[in-house]
Each structure stands twice: as C-alpha cells, then as structure tokens.
C-alpha cells in the first residue's frame, strides 16, 4: 500500500475509464444535483473498490466535483477516531466528508456503494411518520409497483408488489458523524434494510454495487414522493 507520506497518490484518481470510482462519483453527484438531492454542498457518495474507498469531499458544490477532489481511504480502516482513518489520498485544501463513518458502516455490511441525499421527499416522509406513528415509527408502504426495485435482503431477491417495504428512521444530530451509532443500531434492528432515513435531514442508501445503490435510491425517492401525495389525498400507504 502506498503511504500518503510518500506523495499524494494522485494516480489513484486518474483514469480514462468512466466506470472508475473517481469518475463515477462526480457523475453521480451531478445526477443527484439535477434531482435536487445534493443542493448547497449537502449529501455525498462513496464507492468501495477492492481495498480502496473513494469518497466525495465535504463542503464542496456537488455538481462541480472533479476526480482530483476525491479522497481515498485504505480499507479496512477504523471509523473512530477520525485521526486513525487510513487516508492514502487527501486533496489539498478540502475536508474529508463528515459522512465517512456512516459510509464505513455500510461497507462493513458488504456494500459496494453508499449514497447520502437531502431529498425533500425523504425529509417529508420522516415528518409524516412522526406525526402519525410517533418518533419510534418506521416508513411503510405496500402494493406499489416500484417496490420491486428494492431488495428483500442479502441474497433474498427483490421485493414483490404485495410486500410491505419498511425503512427505519433515526433522529438527526447536530453533527453528521454523531449519527453513526443510531445508524448502526437501525441496521441491527432491520438487518434486511438497504436504507436508513434521518428525520428532518435525508437518507442513506447503499447497494452491492454502484448501479444497485443508484437505482435503489431512485426507487425510494419515487416511493417517498408518491407517499407524500397519497397522504395529501387521504390514501393509506399500506393496503389492508
């Protein structure tokens, strides 16, 4: 493994391959920006490839990210303390993502990509669930075709039309990294989930690879928007 002391390892983010993580992350962030998911520098994305983790920087306009802005970690690496994380590439004058320990939690579950968005629809459903079910409630919806875009769990295939999708919700914190414990607890309580909502904040979605994480994120956002409109029309999310 190349040590960052020997140079900034710029070769790790230099590739003509559009499927290289250093090229995919900027492309994903531009796509997410067009959906309104990562406005105002919010949100982020991370990809694991072999023993490297590629992460979008913090505090940067996501639609303007370039490959040379990407951080690279050696994997496995400690989540805490931040000083123990094994960065092998750090862009000059940029800050590591505050989402890093949450991304690492997803990779510990076998994910190949993790996405964090500030989707308005995700935020709205967390508020509606809190009002209708209280702070312990989770998001549930059934009998909607798009549910088929979400896995049942690792190695269990995809959900069906008649299944009830459940997404846990955790409370927001003042600092992003402080969400890690709650996220991990939700993962333990819902071992088949591929997403965790954060009340008044957004959502974390992960998948076995980039394509799966992206399409699952899109499917969930579709379902959240639909759920908000269904609620407005007085329609139940779960068909009895």
Swiss-Prot record:
Cellular component terms (Gene Ontology): cytoplasm
Catalyzed reactions per annotation: 5-(methylsulfanyl)-D-ribulose 1-phosphate = 5-methylsulfanyl-2,3-dioxopentyl phosphate + H2O
Q: Where is the active site?
A: 145
- Location in or out of the cell: Cytoplasm
Which EC class heads this enzyme's classification? lyase
Give me the residues that bind substrate, please. 99
Q: Which residues bind Zn(2+)?
A: 116, 118, 201
What does the record give as the function of this protein? Answer: Catalyzes the dehydration of methylthioribulose-1-phosphate (MTRu-1-P) into 2,3-diketo-5-methylthiopentyl-1-phosphate (DK-MTP-1-P).
Instruction: Give the InterPro entries listed for this entry.
Output: Aldolase_II/adducin_N, Aldolase_II/adducin_N_sf, MethylthioRu-1-P_deHdtase_MtnB, Salvage_MtnB_euk
Q: Give the primary localization class.
A: cytoplasm
- Keywords on record: Amino-acid biosynthesis, Cytoplasm, Lyase, Metal-binding, Methionine biosynthesis, Zinc
Task: Tell me how the cofactor is bound.
Answer: Binds 1 zinc ion per subunit.
Pathways involved: Amino-acid biosynthesis; L-methionine biosynthesis via salvage pathway; L-methionine from S-methyl-5-thio-alpha-D-ribose 1-phosphate: step 2/6
Please list the cofactors this protein needs.
Zn(2+)
Q: Name one Pfam family in it.
A: Aldolase_II
Question: Which residues are in coiled coils?
Answer: none
Q: Name one GO molecular function term.
A: zinc ion binding
Protein name, as recorded: Methylthioribulose-1-phosphate dehydratase
- Origin, by domain of life? Eukaryota
Q: Which family does it belong to?
A: Belongs to the aldolase class II family. MtnB subfamily.
Q: What is its EC number?
A: 4.2.1.109
- Gene Ontology biological process: L-methionine salvage from methylthioadenosine
